[in-house]
């Protein structure tokens, strides 16, 4: 999706 939710951002941050 174009708009990434905070959950998505947090998920990516957690993955890294």
UniProtKB/Swiss-Prot annotation:
It comes from the Eukaryota. It catalyses: 2 (2R)-3-phosphoglycerate + 2 H(+) = D-ribulose 1,5-bisphosphate + CO2 + H2O; D-ribulose 1,5-bisphosphate + O2 = 2-phosphoglycolate + (2R)-3-phosphoglycerate + 2 H(+). It is found in: Plastid, Chloroplast. GO terms for cellular component: chloroplast. GO terms for molecular function: monooxygenase activity; ribulose-bisphosphate carboxylase activity. It is an enzyme of class 4 (lyase). Coiled coil: none annotated. The modification N-acetylproline is found at residue 1. GO terms for biological process: photorespiration; reductive pentose-phosphate cycle. Its EC number is 4.1.1.39. Keywords: Acetylation, Calvin cycle, Carbon dioxide fixation, Chloroplast, Lyase, Methylation, Monooxygenase, Oxidoreductase, Photorespiration, Photosynthesis, Plastid. The modification N6,N6,N6-trimethyllysine is found at residue 12. The basic functional RuBisCO is composed of a large chain homodimer in a 'head-to-tail' conformation. In form I RuBisCO this homodimer is arranged in a barrel-like tetramer with the small subunits forming a tetrameric 'cap' on each end of the 'barrel'. Heterohexadecamer of 8 large chains and 8 small chains. Belongs to the RuBisCO large chain family. Type I subfamily. RuBisCO catalyzes two reactions: the carboxylation of D-ribulose 1,5-bisphosphate, the primary event in carbon dioxide fixation, as well as the oxidative fragmentation of the pentose substrate in the photorespiration process. Both reactions occur simultaneously and in competition at the same active site. This is Ribulose bisphosphate carboxylase large chain. It comes from Capsicum annuum (Capsicum pepper).
